[in-house]
Amino acid sequence: PIRSSAASDVYKRQFEDMVAYQEEVRDPTRIVEVLNRVIMNAKRASAPAQINIPRDMWTQVIDIDLPAIVEFERPSGGDNAISEAAEMLSSSKNPIILNGAGVVLSEGAIDASKALAERLDAAVCVGYQHNDAFPGSHPLFAGPLGYNGSKAAMELIKDADVVLCLGTRLNPFSTLPGYGIDYWPEDAKIIQVDINPDRIGSVSYTHLTLPTT
């Protein structure tokens, strides 16, 4: 944006519902400081963040020192919530696991979800456009939900009494009816696990939530 408070406000309003954090560079000598802060907030929220750089700064040459990105460790779900989730799953007659992008991005999460699925004998569905969130050759893999998804996956999750949602915010592309099948199990208990607590429960009602690292 150009250096104008009115223009800056317009840009902020355009993106405010799409990003977790916004900041504008006011002083070219502090651009790296601002960028560092924007990156940290994007990592903290596991979501996009926006930096606004006024046009008259684009061609400026400055001397800067590059600061280190500050790393941090996120808290994970509490013992009570984990115990409650374990009880829900162990007592379930028809549990289903739904893997999202977070499973792909988390080290070892695909193998962990595979081991859990085998222990529970639970079918595994994946979210829209996240077929890589579970091995396609595994006998418990049911397929993707949502647009052009798997009818088998939709039929299976429709009858679930507990759905363990891993690394997904349950957006409409993964929960809206497909092929005329209104498959999202409204009476099932939903356990949602995600790195960003702001996304938990924001799209679909959940019975138990576990923010994770």
Locate the predicted segments by residue.
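Short internal beta-strands
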Residues: 52, 123-128, 191-194
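Anionic-ligand anchoring segments at beta-strand to alpha-helix junctions in alpha/beta enzyme folds, i.e.
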Residues: 93-160
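Structural signature of the thiamine diphosphate
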Residues: 15-66, 85-88, 154-184, 188-191
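Short alpha-helices
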Residues: 195-197, 202-208
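Glycine-rich beta-alpha junction loops
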Residues: 53-59, 101-103, 130, 197
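Single conserved hydrophobic/aromatic residue that forms the stacking wall/gate
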Residues: 1-7, 11, 213
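A general structural motif
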Residues: 72-86, 126, 145-149
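Acidic/glycine-enriched edge-of-secondary-structure segments
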Residues: 62-77, 136-143
